[in-house]
Design a protein with these regions (language model features):
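Catalytic nucleophile-elbow at a beta strand-turn-alpha helix junction centered on a G-D-S/GDSL motif
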Residues: 2-17
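Alpha-helical cap/lid subdomain in secreted, periplasmic
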Residues: 22, 26-27, 35-134
């Protein structure tokens, strides 16, 4: 049985909505607008075992080692067979997130591949969902 979790900030909220419109068995969502890595670290850890997880975080955090350390703690506290990180539009934040993903051998999807109006959110989350569900 397929089980997935989407965790993170507003890009996670939008991505989850688009993915769950397409799946019969919906992904669980732990995402809120403007969430930072520090806030996500304080959330209760999921007790369910998920096969896949999409991490959508970093857009609301400054780039750099302190943010990377928080994201590494979040990632270390959870075990999944497959993890995909959404890389934020901001290149500094994207580098920070991608460095964490690389340390764990996780996959990434660069949001910069998708049109945006505000430089933070994709214009069409349906395009992001299509790329993730391939």
């Amino acid at each position: 049985m397929f089980s997935c979790l989407i965790i993170g900030d507003s890009t996670g909220v939008g991505t989850a909505h688009a993915i769950n419109q397409r799946l019969e068995q919906r992904c669980d969502v732990l995402a809120v607008e403007r969430a930072t890595a520090a806030q996500i670290m304080a959330w209760p850890k999921p007790t369910k075992n998920y096969g896949s997880c999409i991490f959508a975080m970093g857009s609301n955090d400054p780039p750099g080692e302190r943010s990377a350390e928080k994201m590494m703690r979040i990632r270390s506290a959870m075990c999944f067979r497959r993890v995909i990180w959404l890389l934020p539009y901001g290149r500094g934040q994207a580098y920070t997130v991608s460095s964490v993903a690389a340390r764990f051998g996780d996959e990434t999807l660069d949001l910069r591949c998708f049109p945006t109006r505000d430089g933070i959110h994709p214009s069409r989350y349906s395009d992001v969902a299509s790329a993730l569900l391939r």
